[in-house]
From Swiss-Prot:
Forms part of the ribosomal stalk, playing a central role in the interaction of the ribosome with GTP-bound translation factors. InterPro entries: Ribosomal_uL10, Ribosomal_uL10-like_sf, Ribosomal_uL10_bac, Ribosomal_uL10_bac_type. This is Large ribosomal subunit protein uL10. The gene is rplJ. It comes from the Bacteria.
């Protein structure tokens, strides 16, 4: 038995809400994945504030209709699709999907959309290779700390150098 019009409208509204909060969308071919494997993917995505929705392409098409931010997603809506919608750690979600695909060897990323731009598989892989937000913040903090240390050493070196020069001059004057 098919879905009623009301349930389809409810699904479209839920998709619109998820898309409104999402920063990135990935489109995966889920053909051949078991329910257990899909549950595993959903669990992996939770840590990165990602959700995986399996829905008909026509319902997703209705959800993105008239939304310029997501309209480019239309070109990926063919075949059996699962949609990964990410509203937080984009890199973490891509890494979770890549780890899942490596473990199962069944799913394939068709493409994605980030900030209105269609992403190829290579661009998605590049996002997954980026360090996490926390790692980047640690690198920046380390760089700032190194600069502050060098400035402090430089400021401290001026009077020390002057003192050494005066001492050397005084010693050479005695001889």
């Amino acid at each position: 038995m098919g879905r009623t019009l009301e349930s389809k409208q409810q699904i479209v509204e839920e998709l619109k809400q998820l898309l409104g909060e999402a920063e990135m969308a990935l489109v995966l071919d889920y053909q051949g994945l078991s329910i257990k494997e899909m549950s595993d993917l959903r669990t992996r995505l939770q840590a990165a504030n990602g959700v995986c929705k399996v829905t008909k392409n026509t319902l997703m098409r209705r959800a993105i209709d008239g939304d310029s931010a997501w309209s480019n997603l239309d070109s990926l809506l063919t075949g059996t699709n699962a949609f990964v919608l990410v509203k937080g750690d984009v890199g973490g979600a891509v890494k979770a999907v890549q780890a899942f695909q490596k473990d199962t060897k069944k799913s394939e990323t068709k493409g994605g959309l980030f900030e209105g731009k269609l992403l190829s598989q290579d661009e998605i892989k590049a996002i997954g290779d980026l360090p996490s937000k926390e790692a980047l913040m640690a690198q920046i903090a380390g760089a700032i700390n190194a600069v502050a240390t060098k400035v402090a050493v430089g400021i401290n070196e001026v009077p020390s150098g002057l003192a050494r020069a005066l001492k050397q001059h005084a010693e050479s004057g005695e001889g």
